[in-house]
Design a protein with these regions (language model features):
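Alpha-helical cap/lid subdomain in secreted, periplasmic
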Residues: 1-139
Length: 139
């Protein structure tokens, strides 16, 4: 985080993290462990006068490469905690989940080729949301 944000003199950071942790890509992690990582990054940013946009984790009904991790249940729980923390810490919360949720805590094929990774159309949904958040945070 230091090398990617602080050391380069960034004035704003967009933090979108957590789905790989829920999938267990680097080993098991609890929702609270993931939240603590996000809190650490946010705290470091704020301590260095970097504005923060804290994003929700994108919806995923399941992970094709790591089944039975229940992301459709865990991601909404994590997002609720992220939103609460963002409000408490005074940083902007960007709700990508709501924009892509197909009503089943997943993403439709139009927006994701595997239910996790976005297609160009998926990124087109997120782009105006991020642009709006950046305008609010950097004004």
């Amino acid at each position: 985080f230091y090398a990617d944000v602080i050391d380069i003199g960034a004035t704003t950071v967009v933090i979108l993290a957590g789905t790989n942790d829920i999938a267990g890509n680097t080993g098991p992690m609890s929702i609270d462990m993931i939240l603590n990582n996000l809190k650490s990054m946010t705290g470091i940013a704020l301590a260095n006068n970097v504005k923060v946009i804290l994003c929700s984790v994108l919806p995923a009904y399941d992970y094709p490469w790591s089944p039975n991790k229940n992301p459709n249940i865990k991601i909404p729980k994590l997002n609720s905690k992220i939103k609460k923390y963002a409000k408490k810490s005074g940083v902007h919360y960007l709700d990508y989940f709501k924009a892509l949720d197909n009503g089943n805590n997943g993403i439709d094929k139009e927006f994701s080729y595997d239910g996790v990774h976005l297609t160009l159309e998926g990124y087109k949904v997120l782009e105006p949301l991020l642009e709006n958040a950046l305008k609010k945070v950097t004004k």
